Every structure is written in C-alpha cells, then in structure tokens.
Amino acid sequence: MDLTALREEYTRHGLTRDDLEDNPFKQFEKWFQQATEAELSEPNAMSLATASAKGEPSIRTVLLKYFDEKGFVFFTNYESRKAQQIEENPHVALLFLWLPLERQVKIQGTATKVSTAESLNYFTSRPRGSQLGAWCSAQSSVISSRKLLEMKFEELKYKFQHGEIPLPSFWGGYRVKPTRFEFWQGRPNRLHDRFSYTLTETDDTTWGIHRLAP
C-alpha cells in the first residue's frame, strides 16, 4: 500500500522561546490544560516505551493519572511485560500526541514503583468493574479464550460481592521522573518548532532550554 500521498500541512500555531515556561512541568501543564479545553479524546493517553536488559524495545499506550514535579504516574500489573522490562531497565520514554493541536511532548526519565499506600489510594477510586479487572487479568500472559477470562471475572465478582475489593499485591503504580522533555509544534513546510529541556550537570532542579532543528 502506497501512503506517500497522505500529507497534512501544519498551520495552527508557532512556538518561540518567549512562549515557554522556564519550568518544563509548568509548560507541560499549560499544554495539557489547552488539550483538555480543546476537548480532545483522552488527552492523558500516552505512549510508554520500555526496553529489556538486552535492549529489546516495547511500546504501548497507557493513561497518565496524575503528575507534579516529582514525576508522571501511571498504574499497571506488576507482572506485565512493561513491568518486567522496567525491572530490568528503568529508563523509559513517554509520548503525548495531540494531533488536533499539531503538538507532541516527549519525556525521558526513570520509572520507579510508587508506595503501596499511593497505589491503594488510586485503586479505591476506580470503578468496581475496573478493580475486578485488575484481579482478573494476568496481563501479557497467554490465555486460551475470552470465555475463560469472563468466567474468572464472574467468579471474582461473586467472591468480592460483599465489602471492598482489596488491592492486588501484583498491581500498582509507577512514577516516571523526567531527565529530558521535548515540546514539538507542527509548522508549515515541515519547519517544525522543537524545544528541549535537559537537566544541567550542576544540579537536578535547573533546566537548560534549547531550540532543536526540525
């Protein structure tokens, strides 16, 4: 299939150094709020790239649940492929793509597990069906049929029919602590605006900002 004719011209916005916050977390928050105000579908959806100890890459979409200057937090099964790769190699990358705004944000950093208390706090806020789903799915493992998955869901639904559903020991959150951000704004003629934020060598709170060639 030839896709060479598929082409979009980006004309919505420009991005200059004067537009940027000195703090990349504040810049991300500003863009995220604009994506939310534009009513984009799931603006918190992000691609998460991981790699094994051998350097074998894997990527998938997960949902950002909250962020602050300590990092970006998502939740998953601790026995999943992504969790196994993070255990072997904590260096990860995140990508937010907001096509209607002709923007994307890349974040590189290291992932570490959040505390059990933090995982529990989020788990108890989830809909009951999602809580059961966390118990039900041995994520990334081979299963023989969907029917068995649905049967297990019903069994767990009956088992936990009275009272609160406990936090599974194999489920919880990760916090990605950034070491680099890149903000990309589409521009005409593929002369896009790109700016990177990288931590300086002197401390872990000062960010150097640089324009990058598209």
From Swiss-Prot:
Alphabetic keyword roster: Flavoprotein, FMN, Oxidoreductase, Pyridoxine biosynthesis
Species this protein is from: Crocosphaera subtropica (strain ATCC 51142 / BH68) (Cyanothece sp. (strain ATCC 51142))
Subunit structure: Homodimer.
Highest taxon in the source lineage: Bacteria
Binding site for substrate: 7-10, 65, 122, 126, 130, 190-192
Top-level EC class: oxidoreductase
EC number: 1.4.3.5
Binding, FMN: 60-65, 75-76, 81-82, 104, 139-140, 184, 194
PROSITE patterns on file: PYRIDOX_OXIDASE
Cofactor(s) needed by this chain: FMN
Family (UniProt): Belongs to the pyridoxamine 5'-phosphate oxidase family.
Cofactor binding, note field: Binds 1 FMN per subunit.
Function summary: Catalyzes the oxidation of either pyridoxine 5'-phosphate (PNP) or pyridoxamine 5'-phosphate (PMP) into pyridoxal 5'-phosphate (PLP).
Metabolic or biological pathway: Cofactor metabolism; pyridoxal 5'-phosphate salvage; pyridoxal 5'-phosphate from pyridoxamine 5'-phosphate: step 1/1; Cofactor metabolism; pyridoxal 5'-phosphate salvage; pyridoxal 5'-phosphate from pyridoxine 5'-phosphate: step 1/1
Annotated GO biological process: pyridoxine biosynthetic process
The protein, known as: Pyridoxine/pyridoxamine 5'-phosphate oxidase
Molecular function terms, GO-annotated: FMN binding; pyridoxamine phosphate oxidase activity
Catalytic reactions on record: pyridoxamine 5'-phosphate + O2 + H2O = pyridoxal 5'-phosphate + H2O2 + NH4(+); pyridoxine 5'-phosphate + O2 = pyridoxal 5'-phosphate + H2O2
